[in-house]
Amino acid sequence: MLDDRSAIEHHKYSQRLTELERRSAAAQQRQQKKKPPKMHVGNKIRGIKIKRYVSNGERVLKLVVLFSAILLFMLYIISPLSKITTLHVTGNHDLTKEQVEKNANIYPGRFIWGVYLARHQLTKQAIRKNPQIKDLRIKVTGPQSLQISVKENALLGIAVMNNDTYAVLADGQLQRTKNADNGIAYKRFDGHKKVLATTAAQLGKLKLAIRNGISSVSYQPTKEYPDRVIIYMRDGNTVYGDLNTIGDKMGYYPAIAASMKNKGIIDLQVGAYSYDYGSKDK
């Protein structure tokens, strides 16, 4: 009887043990499905080596491309392909293209990047050589083409002093010249260079339309008006003015001239008024 009972209990224990083993195996299978299989250490090392190799290869390629580009650019700089073949000059009115090129020392055949890198020095050099050049802008417009934009000190006219002929510029500078150009004729300024420079700087403020209407300017001081200049207009009128203020007051000339019925004198020395020739002795 005892043997039968012991056999039954042993059988039940074996069944429970089998059931537990089955559940444990099933749980392990589920967990293995959730987690990816572990990579072998050797495979990991191989993968790291491959990544490093690819990364190093990319770095080397980038360096090769960079140094190749630098080398090609350096070869281009010293090759005939970087020499100026086309040169454009813009903004010049009184100056010729050749004068601008000569004063700036820029010409076809020079290395374009050498010119560009030295553009500030070349600009200063041009201004120093020729007062008619107020400013320069140098711009690379192509592999072999360059543009020079010039800003001029306008040429107002010519003055003859002590047998020397001077070009009178809009900023008041005087430039000795051999060419008697058209423009405003400056008279009776002998021995008065500073007065001429001040007068020129004042007239340089005027709009081009007014300035082009001036035929000549004469320095004629009096006791009452020691800074008097007389301006003879191309339309037949005469303007009396102060050489220190004439640049501002001449701005009223078009309106005053339009209101006059006859040709006459416009006095801008003190205030602003006009009268016909012969109607008032001044």
UniProtKB/Swiss-Prot annotation:
Residues 82-153 form the POTRA domain. Gene3D superfamilies: 3.40.50.10960. Keywords: Cell cycle, Cell division, Cell membrane, Membrane, Transmembrane, Transmembrane helix. The gene is divIB. Belongs to the FtsQ/DivIB family. DivIB subfamily. It comes from Limosilactobacillus reuteri (strain ATCC 55730 / SD2112) (Lactobacillus reuteri). Residues 19-41 are annotated as: Disordered. It is a single-pass type II membrane protein. The chain crosses the membrane at residues 60-80. Cell division protein that may be involved in stabilizing or promoting the assembly of the division complex. Residues 81-282 are extracellular. Residues 1-59 are cytoplasmic. Residues 31-41 have a biased composition (Basic residues). The keyword Oxidoreductase does not apply. GO terms for cellular component: cell division site; plasma membrane. One of its GO terms (biological process) is FtsZ-dependent cytokinesis. Pfam families: POTRA_1. This is Cell division protein DivIB. Signal peptide: none annotated.
